[in-house]
C-alpha cells in the first residue's frame, strides 16, 4: 500500500508501524508533484489496482463571513487537489484497461449547508466530476467509485460548533469504505446509511421545504 499526505512525520509513523505500507509525501495542489509521486509509486509497485483520493479542508469560522482567500484555498485543495491527483493516474489506468479510481466526496455535496458554502461547493464539484469521469473511464473498463461519508470525527469536524447527527469514528469509515470497494459493485459508497438516506431525501425536496427544515434545524449556528 502506498500512502500520501502533506504531513511527512505522520506518514512515516504509519509506514514504520505497519509492514507493507510505504509513504510518499505530497501536496496535492502541486500538479507536477502529483505526477512525479505517482511515477515513483509505479516504479515501486509495478502494477496498481486501485487509487483512493481523499482531500479535504474546511474553515467554518471563515465561511460565516465570506473570505475569498479561504474560499479559493478550500476549492484549490478539495477540488483541484483531487483533480490533480486523478490527472496523474488517468492515462495509466486507461492504458491498463482495468483498475479502480475512488473519489472521497461528502454528503455535504448533496446540497448547500449553512456555514459551509465553499466546502459544500467543493464536494458538489467533486461529485459531479466523479459522475462525468465514470462515463469516460467505463469505455476503458476502469471503474470509478464515489465515496460520500456523513460526519466523521476528525480534527476537521472538531471545528464545528453545532451538533453533528450520527457522527462516526474514522475506524467505522475505513471499514465502510473497505467493504464498499472490495465486496460491492455500486458507483456510490455512502454511510452511515441512516443519515445518508435522510440527506438523499433532502436532496430531492423542493427548495422552500428544504430551506425551512434547515433553517429550523440549524438555529444553534451563530453568524
Predicted regions and their residues:
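C-terminal helical subdomain
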Residues: 146, 162-197
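Rossmann-fold cofactor-recognition segment
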Residues: 17-32
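Residue(s) in the substrate-gating loop at a strand-loop-helix junction
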Residues: 106
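Conserved NAD(P)H cofactor-binding loop of Rossmann-fold oxidoreductase domains
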Residues: 54-59
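Substrate-binding pocket helix/loop in short-chain dehydrogenase/reductase
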Residues: 62-73
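Active-site helix of classical SDR
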Residues: 86, 122
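Conserved glycine-rich Rossmann-like NAD(P)H-binding loop of the short-chain dehydrogenase/reductase
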Residues: 1-13
Amino acid at each position: 500500500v502506498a500512502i500520501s499526505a502533506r504531513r511527512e512525520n505522520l506518514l512515516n509513523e504509519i509506514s514504520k508501524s505497519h509492514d507493507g505500507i510505504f509513504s510518499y509525501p505530497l501536496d496535492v495542489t502541486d500538479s507536477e508533484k502529483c505526477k512525479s509521486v505517482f511515477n515513483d509509486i509505479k516504479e515501486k509497485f509495478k502494477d496498481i489496482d486501485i487509487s483512493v483520493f481523499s482531500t479535504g479542508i474546511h474553515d467554518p469560522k471563515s465561511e460565516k463571513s465570506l473570505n475569498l482567500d479561504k474560499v479559493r484555498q478550500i476549492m484549490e485543495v478539495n477540488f483541484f487537489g483531487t483533480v490533480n491527483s486523478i490527472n496523474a493516474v488517468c492515462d495509466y489506468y486507461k492504458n491498463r484497461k482495468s483498475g479502480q479510481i475512488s473519489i472521497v466526496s461528502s454528503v455535504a455535496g448533496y446540497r448547500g449547508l449553512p456555514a459551509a458554502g465553499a466546502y459544500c461547493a467543493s464536494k458538489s464539484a467533486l461529485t459531479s466530476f466523479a459522475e462525468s469521469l465514470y462515463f469516460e473511464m467505463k469505455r476503458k473498463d476502469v471503474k470509478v467509485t464515489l465515496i460520500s461519508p456523513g460526519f466523521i470525527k476528525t480534527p476537521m469536524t472538531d471545528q464545528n460548533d453545532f451538533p453533528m447527527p450520527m457522527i462516526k469514528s474514522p475506524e467505522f469509515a475505513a471499514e465502510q469504505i473497505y467493504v464498499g470497494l472490495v465486496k460491492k459493485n455500486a458507483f456510490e459508497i455512502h454511510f452511515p446509511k441512516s443519515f445518508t438516506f435522510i440527506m438523499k431525501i433532502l436532496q430531492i425536496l423542493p427548495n422552500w421545504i428544504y430551506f425551512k427544515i434547515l433553517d429550523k434545524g440549524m438555529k444553534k449556528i451563530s453568524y
